[in-house]
């Protein structure tokens, strides 16, 4: 890239590679391009620390947190709060099986936009995460049910702020 060449022309040693975050113990399926540059000599990222059968899972990351209902806040942790859901979205989530999404709903619960050719391509929205796998990439709207596969694996709610933070590897404190 132009930026990489600029760095090299300025005397930097450059390492650029895609990184799959679960390979480094991060419990989300985030892919990122990482660029490291040094004027002190060759530089590169450490080798992956986790193999696929060792990837950190949703259950390992958030499975010990207290249960919540949609709209509730844990009395001991103000960040462990789940957004309230409309009765219609609670009904939709109730019809979303483990690991499922809006595609599993009865037709009368499906949104009009999902019935169009364009809408069918967004198969993971209103989806539930799976305990045994890393979470999807956390986004700025990850505590909202309709913004991706951010439904709790077994509770009828979207993930809490605390759960999203833990999945992003922020500490409890």
Briefly describe each language-model feature range.
Residues 20-22, 68, 173:
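Short, solvent-exposed coil/turn elements at secondary-structure transition points
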Residues 26-80:
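Flexible, glycine-/basic-rich loop-and-beta segments that form/coincide
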């Amino acid at each position: 890239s132009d930026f990489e060449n600029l760095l090299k022309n300025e005397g930097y040693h450059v390492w650029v590679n895609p990184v799959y975050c679960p390979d480094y113990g991060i419990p989300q399926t985030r892919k990122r391009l990482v660029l490291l540059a040094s004027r002190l000599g060759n530089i590169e990222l450490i080798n992956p620390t986790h193999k696929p059968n060792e990837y950190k899972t949703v259950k390992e990351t958030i499975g010990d947190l207290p249960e919540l209902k949609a709209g509730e806040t844990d009395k001991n942790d103000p960040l462990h709060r789940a957004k309230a859901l409309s009765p219609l979205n609670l009904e939709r989530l109730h019809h979303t099986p483990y690991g499922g999404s809006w595609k599993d709903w009865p037709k009368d619960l499906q949104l009009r936009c999902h019935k169009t050719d364009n809408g069918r391509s967004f198969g993971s929205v209103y989806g539930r995460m799976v305990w045994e796998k890393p979470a999807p990439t956390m986004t700025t709207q990850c505590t909202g049910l309709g913004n991706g596969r951010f439904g709790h694996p077994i509770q009828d709610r979207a993930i809490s702020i605390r759960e999203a933070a833990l999945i992003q590897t922020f500490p409890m404190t």
